[in-house]
Regions:
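Bacterial N-terminal signal peptides
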Residues: 4-14
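Secondary-structure boundary elements
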Residues: 42-46, 53-175, 211
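Hydrophobic/aromatic-rich core segments of domains that either
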Residues: 142-149, 159-171, 175-176, 181-270
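Beta-strand-rich domain onsets/edges
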Residues: 266-300
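Extracellular beta-sheet/turn segments enriched in Thr/Pro/Gly and aliphatic residues
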Residues: 282-295, 360-380
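A short, amphipathic beta-strand motif
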Residues: 299-309
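Short, ordered, surface-exposed loop/turn motifs in non-cytosolic proteins
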Residues: 308-329, 347-348
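Short Pro-Gly-centered beta-turn/loop motif in secreted/extracellular proteins
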Residues: 334-352, 356-357, 363-367
């Protein structure tokens, strides 16, 4: 009898351990991430335990690839809601079943793009965006519709007066203003909310040294780019920055083009507002943008028109000289700072650039070079 009691006690003691072991279904990368969670470990384990079995791969992906700061702060309710809504969207759209698992996990599921404030934007964007894309047949078509409609609805536009470069959607909506990065975050999140794989892409500095830029790539049987809040009626893979991107240099850290990734990689996405922060993984995608430089036979003139307070103005601009009949409209404050009206002119010739009744005489330089011409228009 004593032996039986001893064996029974041993079996009973073993049962909780066995059950506990079975409940911990996750793999080594998740276990390693949990070790970095500190006091928040219980919240992550709660999310892992509660997630439906058909969503386990997604929750494991998130936890295994989270930045340390998120491991130590994000709560189970946040993670469970984010994951559930991502799967819900996948079932609601025509293209959901065709999205490769790799793109779903890395470019639909994640709750953040770079280092913006973490917030549960997915529910609001799902409700706003699903009616916009409901009749679309492809993720690319859906992205185009969102880019053409959402910013008007949200009343958010580009502005250098925004509070921060890396604003979350709610921060940009509250101000009605955002940087190219803030606009890209909104478009990426809106796309992800309706199962359009999307990611931020950018360069720390154009090769011509006219500044940095951020835009969006969406997946539709391959990656395609678009400028956030800059939809081109002709479709994806068009934008004012195409020429600048063609000059990118893959092996130059500051002049290369990077796509942000949630999944860990061996390089980081340069955050121009926080260059010491190397916590956002990235992929160098310069090869898809850079083109062999054809020998140029013209001199490029980029025109900026401003008022007395240096605010950019959208006004008619003409160029007269050897080559007549050139005209266009300068960019106003709602256009990206680096988006300038461009004229390709014969080299070493004299021209007159006119805007708002103000004339400026210029002499073009050598072929292949460029110059920014700024014209200040007096107040009316």
């Amino acid at each position: 009898v004593g032996i039986r009691v001893t064996l029974l006690a041993a079996l009973l003691a073993a049962c909780p351990a066995t059950a506990d072991s079975a409940a911990r279904w996750w793999d080594a990368p998740v276990a390693d991430a949990l070790k970095k969670a500190g006091d928040n470990r219980a919240e992550l384990e709660k999310a892992l335990a509660a997630v439906p079995k058909d969503q386990r791969a997604a929750m494991a992906f998130l936890v295994a690839n989270m930045p340390d700061g998120d491991l130590q702060k994000l709560k189970s309710d946040f993670l469970l809601a984010n994951t559930d809504l991502a799967y819900k969207a996948r079932k609601e759209v025509a293209w959901g079943k065709d999205i490769p698992e790799e793109q779903f996990l890395n470019d639909v599921l994640p709750y953040a793009n770079v280092d913006e404030t973490r917030e549960l934007w997915r529910k609001d964007f799902f409700e706003r965006c699903l009616p916009i894309v409901k009749e679309c047949k492809t993720p690319g078509e859906a992205a185009q519709k969102l880019n053409g409609n959402l910013f008007k609805t949200l009343k958010v536009k580009y502005s250098t007066e925004r509070k921060a470069a890396n604003q979350s959607p709610s921060e940009s909506i509250a101000q009605g203003k955002a940087s190219c990065t803030g606009l890209s975050i909104i478009l990426c999140d809106a796309c992800r909310a309706v199962c359009v794989p999307a990611r931020l892409v950018g360069t720390p500095l154009w090769a011509n040294k006219r500044g940095n830029h951020t835009w969006v790539e969406v997946w539709d049987n391959g990656w395609h780019f678009t400028g956030a809040c800059e939809p081109d009626p002709s479709g994806l893979d068009r934008g004012w920055f195409v020429g600048d991107a063609a000059q990118a240099k893959k092996d130059s850290f500051e002049h290369a083009i990077y796509a942000a990734s949630f999944k860990k990689t061996d390089q980081h996405f340069p955050l121009v507002w926080a260059m010491r922060n190397k916590n956002v993984p990235a992929e160098n995608v310069t090869d898809r943008y850079a083109k062999p430089a054809a020998k140029s036979e013209t001199f490029r003139v980029l025109v900026r028109v401003v008022d007395s307070s240096k605010k950019r103005l959208a006004v008619a601009v003409t160029v007269t000289g050897e080559k007549t009949g050139l005209s266009g409209t300068s960019r106003g404050e709602s256009a990206d700072t680096n988006d300038l009206l461009t004229f390709d002119l014969p080299p070493a010739k004299e021209f007159v650039v006119t805007a708002g009744g103000v004339e400026k005489k210029i002499t073009t330089g050598k072929a292949g070079e460029q110059r920014v011409v700024e014209i200040q228009v007096p107040a009316k």
